[in-house]
Amino acid sequence: MARRPHNAPPQRDTGPRVNDKIRASEIRLIGADGENVGVVHPAKAMAMAEEAGLDLVEISPNATPPVCKIMDFGKYKYEQQKRESEARKKQKIIEVKEVKFRPNTDTHDYEVKMRNVYKFLENGDKVKVTLRFRGREMAHQNLGRELLERVAEDVKEMGKIENMPKMEGRQMIMMIGPLPQK
């Protein structure tokens, strides 16, 4: 075990209390096969757990009296980690994809870029539509705004506009989010 720096706070045990760590004066005991034994003294419950070759695990510490169960703690921890990893797998990470346009983007290029926007929205990702102005194009910001409004109109069946087009330096940016799944 690694040494702890002298100024670090003591490590807190985050898991459920097990065996002799249970400090209640009496507990509600659930047996190894799930039957309710009743309210007993922790020492008696510990003796029953040792006799069965298992651990006494505090399941709900906030109940009165606290509920404890006779079970294999290693197996319980393993099952809990498995459940947590399954929950993490099911979470969808929403990424922000970026599609860049120019004020003079031609029809075919526009269609190709829009196909990408549709694909990203179908996958449940957000899309950041960036319109970059170069040199004297800054004088024609209205063309850029019209292009982004056209993009917004084309994606309204698949996504919703989260941020309306706004200027950031030499770029006009708009965020599109996917519609919630029904």
UniProtKB/Swiss-Prot annotation:
PROSITE patterns in the cross-refs: IF3
GO CC annotation terms, alphabetical: cytosol; membrane
Signal peptide: none
Pfam family, one: IF3_N
Keywords in alphabetical order: Cytoplasm, Initiation factor, Protein biosynthesis
UniProt KW Cell division keyword: no
Entries under Gene3D superfamilies matching the protein: Translation initiation factor 3 (IF-3), C-terminal domain, Translation initiation factor 3 (IF-3), N-terminal domain
GO BP term, example: ribosome disassembly
Subunit architecture: Monomer.
Family: Belongs to the IF-3 family.
Protein name, entry field: Translation initiation factor IF-3
Gene field: infC
